[in-house]
């Protein structure tokens, strides 16, 4: 099992169907500092990210590990991984290729609470998935 130099609270964000713990991961553009997405990761996903430099997450809906952009081509190259003060959330500082959101938007945070769209759609999801 992968060991890290800091204590991480896997399980703070729930568990997989197999009982593996999850941590919340925020992906942020390393240059613009725009918040791109929130996802979850298992210990294995974090280890793969640290080893490969490519963002890996855990899909709770599909119950599987996934590499960002493996299907769509909208990849995240991870420049740095930061840990929050409680060790139960991570921040991936990334170089984003294409949009981060499966809806085709640059960021998953492309709507206001009033329902207004505030972000650009940078690709057609029908062409990517």
Curated annotation (Swiss-Prot):
Transmembrane segments: none annotated. Its cofactor is Mg(2+); Zn(2+). InterPro entries: PRA-CH (IPR026660), PRib_AMP_CycHydrolase_dom (IPR002496), PRib_AMP_CycHydrolase_sf (IPR038019). GO terms for molecular function: magnesium ion binding; phosphoribosyl-AMP cyclohydrolase activity; zinc ion binding. The keyword Nucleotide-binding does not apply. One of its GO terms (biological process) is L-histidine biosynthetic process. One of its GO terms (cellular component) is cytoplasm. It holds the Pfam family PRA-CH. Keywords: Amino-acid biosynthesis, Cytoplasm, Histidine biosynthesis, Hydrolase, Magnesium, Metal-binding, Zinc. Mg(2+) binds at residues 84, 86, 88. Pathway: Amino-acid biosynthesis; L-histidine biosynthesis; L-histidine from 5-phospho-alpha-D-ribose 1-diphosphate: step 3/9. It is found in: Cytoplasm. Zn(2+) binds at residues 85, 101, 108. Binds 1 Mg(2+) ion per subunit. The keyword Ligase does not apply. It catalyses: 1-(5-phospho-beta-D-ribosyl)-5'-AMP + H2O = 1-(5-phospho-beta-D-ribosyl)-5-[(5-phospho-beta-D-ribosylamino)methylideneamino]imidazole-4-carboxamide. It comes from the Archaea. Its EC number is 3.5.4.19. Belongs to the PRA-CH family. Catalyzes the hydrolysis of the adenine ring of phosphoribosyl-AMP. Homodimer. This is Phosphoribosyl-AMP cyclohydrolase. It comes from Halobacterium salinarum (strain ATCC 700922 / JCM 11081 / NRC-1) (Halobacterium halobium).
């Amino acid at each position: 099992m992968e060991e890290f130099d800091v204590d991480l609270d896997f399980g703070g964000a729930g568990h997989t169907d197999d009982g593996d713990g999850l941590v919340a991961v925020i992906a942020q553009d390393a240059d613009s500092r725009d918040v791109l997405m929130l996802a979850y990761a298992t210990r294995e996903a974090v280890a793969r990210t640290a080893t490969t430099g490519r963002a890996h997450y855990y899909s709770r809906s599909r119950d599987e590990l996934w590499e960002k952009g493996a299907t769509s081509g909208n990849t995240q190259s991870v420049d740095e991984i930061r840990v929050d003060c409680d060790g139960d959330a991570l921040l991936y500082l990334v170089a984003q290729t294409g949009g981060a959101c499966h809806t085709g938007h640059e960021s998953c945070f492309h709507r206001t609470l009033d329902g207004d769209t505030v972000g650009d759609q940078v690709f057609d999801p029908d062409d990517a998935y």
